[in-house]
Amino acid sequence: MASQGTKRSYEQMETGGERQNATEIRASVGRMVGGIGRFYIQMCTELKLSDYEGRLIQNSITIERMVLSAFDERRNKYLEEHPSAGKDPKKTGGPIYKRRDGKWMRELILYDKEEIRRIWRQANNGEDATAGLTHLMIWHSNLNDATYQRTRALVRTGMDPRMCSLMQGSTLPRRSGAAGAAVKGVGTMVMELIRMIKRGINDRNFWRGENGRRTRIAYERMCNILKGKFQTAAQRAMMDQVRESRNPGNAEIEDLIFLARSALILRGSVAHKSCLPACVYGLAVASGYDFEREGYSLVGIDPFRLLQNSQVFSLIRPNENPAHKSQLVWMACHSAAFEDLRVSSFIRGTRVVPRGQLSTRGVQIASNENMETMDSSTLELRSRYWAIRTRSGGNTNQQRASAGQISVQPTFSVQRNLPFERATIMAAFTGNTEGRTSDMRTEIIRMMESARPEDVSFQGRGVFELSDEKATNPVVPSFDMSNEGSYFFGDNAEEYDN
């Protein structure tokens, strides 16, 4: 974090604030999640949900999606100009699950967007509270990251499916602002840029005229966001080349894919935040907790402590394993989809298994699924320890590159090695070092070749007991150095489809 002077912390991005001191940040983040909690309580009242139904994560997700849709100005405008059959542009809704005679029933509800906006503003002191909306988007994004694989999207843009660990935040909407940009992985940014360049190649007018100028500004802004994630001079210099290109084409796509591959070892800085479902904040507010007064942080002990004391339920399909469903949601809550499983398991206190071994599908239930056979169970979201979330890629020795793995983007600031299969990664870098970026490419490859899988990242950083809120006594775990921990290993998850 070389340029800390110019960066806002991500709590500031999250709350849209300018530079504040730690107490002000904690208060404004507290205000944000408190507003989400108040909104949730009000919605439960409107929908006449029982206490149990209000703690159902599927209901929480429906309510969150309704408010996000109510504030999606661009889409609302589009829907009004292109009326489609059976879609009322002024209404939003979704499935709400209720318990009737010992069975779960699905009820489709519909609300005026205007009404939802009113309830949201009322819960947020009359303000639009965009930060709270972004927070919900990031929670949905983290859930998608833990649930789905993006192989198809990676292949479509010419990237390698093994680069999945770079795809954090790939389902975040465009409108997620600075807080959203901070949590996007290198692969996500590369993919957005490649899509843009491809449109430019296929559509002559993409970069032309008044619209083209706006497109160009967006392109350069995205390039700068990606550049800011890289930690080595050579990677940044290559990003300058991509950004300054007169009319971006295949050469730029090549450079971007090269950079994405290099990020498997020379990892980018990607922020991690524990964003919890709205019902969790609702429960806390309902029990009388004053978030704004107490203060709150997305990257410290607070989310862990909140989850220790919250009981959340989930619908379970007939052949799903409730413990596996819990793991999925736990990972989503802590933005740990791309974390090393050794680290996650240690913090959680129970073994976290790779996704290929999970007997569970996604959290959301499709409208055609049979409710007759649905059961519900408690999600086990507690942890044994807590650890500080990181926004660095865990590169060792003074911001130079260190070992990475085909599948890790660290979430927790905890000492470990980042094992990786150098041969696998380096095989992707054969040949092509000519052209205007040749010296940078050579430099990047040299750094990658000198990286050692046994190097230790986050030297001396440990986890903390849940009673240690000031983080005074770090417990530095020792991991089996040979055993890599990829969540996506032997993957069989469903693809993410909008």
Swiss-Prot record:
A Pfam short name: Flu_NP
Assigned keywords, A-Z: Capsid protein, Helical capsid protein, Host nucleus, Host-virus interaction, Ribonucleoprotein, RNA-binding, Viral nucleoprotein, Viral penetration into host nucleus, Virion, Virus entry into host cell
Compartments reported by the entry: Virion; Host nucleus
Changes after translation: Late in virus-infected cells, may be cleaved from a 56-kDa protein to a 53-kDa protein by a cellular caspase. This cleavage might be a marker for the onset of apoptosis in infected cells or have a specific function in virus host interaction.
Motif placement: Bipartite nuclear localization signal: 198-216
InterPro entries: Flu_NP (IPR002141)
Cellular compartments per GO CC: helical viral capsid; host cell; host cell nucleus; ribonucleoprotein complex; viral nucleocapsid
Region annotation (Disordered) ranges: 1-21
Record motif Unconventional nuclear localization signal, residues: 1-18
Main location: virion
Family: Belongs to the influenza viruses nucleoprotein family.
Function: Encapsidates the negative strand viral RNA, protecting it from nucleases. The encapsidated genomic RNA is termed the ribonucleoprotein (RNP) and serves as template for transcription and replication. The RNP needs to be localized in the host nucleus to start an infectious cycle, but is too large to diffuse through the nuclear pore complex. NP comprises at least 2 nuclear localization signals that are responsible for the active RNP import into the nucleus through cellular importin alpha/beta pathway.
Quaternary structure annotation from Swiss-Prot or TrEMBL: Homomultimerizes to form the nucleocapsid. May bind host exportin-1/XPO1. Binds to viral genomic RNA. Protein-RNA contacts are mediated by a combination of electrostatic interactions between positively charged residues and the phosphate backbone and planar interactions between aromatic side chains and bases.
UniProt-recorded name of the protein: Nucleoprotein
Organism per entry: Influenza A virus (strain A/Parrot/Ulster/1973 H7N1)
Lineage, highest ranks first: Viruses, Riboviria, Orthornavirae, Negarnaviricota, Polyploviricotina
